[in-house]
Swiss-Prot record:
GO CC, any one term: plasma membrane
Protein name: Cell division protein FtsX
Topology feature Cytoplasmic, residues: 1-21, 193-219, 289-297
Organism: Mycobacterium leprae (strain TN)
Role of this protein: Part of the ABC transporter FtsEX involved in cellular division.
Name of the encoding gene: ftsX
Organism ancestry: Bacteria, Bacillati, Actinomycetota, Actinomycetes, Mycobacteriales
Domain of life: Bacteria
Residue ranges, Extracellular side: 43-171, 241-267
Length: 297
C-alpha cells in the first residue's frame, strides 16, 4: 500500500468528519485523563503508605498495677512481659513509657488537652516497632491477654482506614473513566461507520479492481487511532498542567509535613506510555470490531 495514498485517505476522512473527530478526541482525552488520574492516586497511596509503614508502631498498654507502681519496668511482671516480647523474632525494637512519660508524650502531641487530661488517664505502655508492620495480627493475638497487658493498639489499622479514603477516590476516578470510555467507544464506532458510508462508492470501485478488504479498511482504522492518539496526548498534557497548577499548590502543606508522598512529573511520565497505549489500543480494537460487524463486503 502506497504511504502517500494512505495518508491522503486518513486526512480526507478526518476532515470530512471534523465534528465527530473533535468529539471523539475530547471524549478520549477525558476518559484517558480520568484513568490517568486514578493511576496517580493509586501511585500516591502506595508511596504514602510506605512512608507511614516506616512510622507504624504497636502500643501495648499495661494494667493499672504496673502503671501506678512501676516507673522503670523493674517489677517481675513487667520484666517478664518485656522479655517475652523482646524475644519474638518479629519485634524490631521496644521502649517502655511509664505513666508520666505517656502523659508528657500525649500533651506534646495534643497540647490542647493539657488542662482536661489527668496523668492517671494514661497507662504505662510498651512502644514496639515490628520487623514487618503489615503482619501485625499474629503479634497482636499473641500479646493480647498476657498477664500485665491491658490492651493492644496497632497504628496499621488506623492507617488502613486513612488510605481507604484514597482507595475510594481512585475507584471513583476509574468508574467515571469507564463510563467515559464507553462513550469514546461508541463515538469511535460511529465515526468509523460514517467514514465508511461516506466513501462507500470509492471502496466499491477499489474492491472491483482487486483491492483487498484490509487495504480498503486500514484508513478507517488509522483515522480512529490518530484521533485517539491526539486525545491521549491531550490527557497527558492535562495531567502535567494539573500537577503544576493545582496539585502542587493544593497539597504543598501536606508535602511539607511529610504526610503524603509527592506527585512528581516523573509519576505522570511513568503512567503516560500506558495511557497512550490504552488510547491507541481502544481505538484500534473498536475500529476493527466495527468494520468486521458493519462493513462485511
Amino acid at each position: 500500500m502506497r504511504f502517500g495514498f494512505l495518508l491522503n485517505e486518513v486526512v480526507t476522512g478526518l476532515r470530512r468528519n471534523v465534528t465527530m473527530t473533535i468529539a471523539m478526541i475530547l471524549t478520549t482525552a477525558i476518559s484517558i485523563g480520568l484513568f490517568g488520574g486514578g493511576l496517580l492516586v493509586v501511585r500516591l497511596a502506595d508511596n504514602s503508605r510506605s512512608i507511614y509503614l516506616d512510622r507504624v508502631e504497636t502500643q501495648v498498654f499495661l494494667t493499672d498495677d504496673i502503671s501506678a507502681n512501676d516507673l522503670t519496668c523493674n517489677t517481675n511482671l513487667c520484666k517478664a512481659l518485656r522479655g517475652k516480647i523482646e524475644a519474638r523474632d518479629d519485634v524490631k525494637s521496644l521502649r517502655f513509657l511509664n505513666r508520666q512519660d505517656a502523659y508528657d508524650d500525649a500533651i506534646r502531641k495534643f497540647p490542647q488537652y493539657r488542662d482536661v487530661a489527668g496523668k492517671d488517664s494514661f497507662p504505662a505502655s510498651f512502644i514496639i516497632k515490628l520487623a514487618n508492620p503489615v503482619q501485625h495480627k499474629e503479634f497482636d493475638a499473641a500479646t493480647q491477654g498476657q498477664p500485665g497487658v491491658l490492651s493492644v493498639l496497632n497504628q496499621k489499622e488506623l492507617i488502613d482506614r486513612l488510605f481507604a479514603v484514597l482507595d475510594g477516590l481512585s475507584d471513583v476516578a476509574f468508574v467515571i473513566a469507564l463510563v467515559q470510555a464507553i462513550g469514546a467507544i461508541l463515538l469511535i464506532a460511529n465515526m468509523v461507520q460514517v467514514a465508511a458510508y461516506t466513501r462507500r462508492t470509492e471502496i466499491g470501485i477499489m474492491r472491483l479492481v482487486g483491492a483487498s478488504r484490509w487495504y480498503t479498511q486500514l484508513p478507517f482504522l488509522l483515522e480512529a487511532m490518530v484521533a485517539a492518539t491526539v486525545g491521549a496526548v491531550i490527557a497527558i498534557v492535562g495531567l502535567l498542567v494539573a500537577r503544576a497548577m493545582f496539585l502542587n499548590n493544593a497539597l504543598n502543606q501536606f508535602y511539607q509535613a511529610n504526610l503524603i508522598a509527592r506527585v512528581d512529573y516523573a509519576d505522570v511520565l511513568y503512567v503516560s506510555p500506558w495511557l497512550l497505549l490504552l488510547g491507541v489500543a481502544l481505538a484500534a480494537l473498536t475500529g476493527y470490531a466495527t468494520l468486521r460487524i458493519y462493513v462485511r463486503r
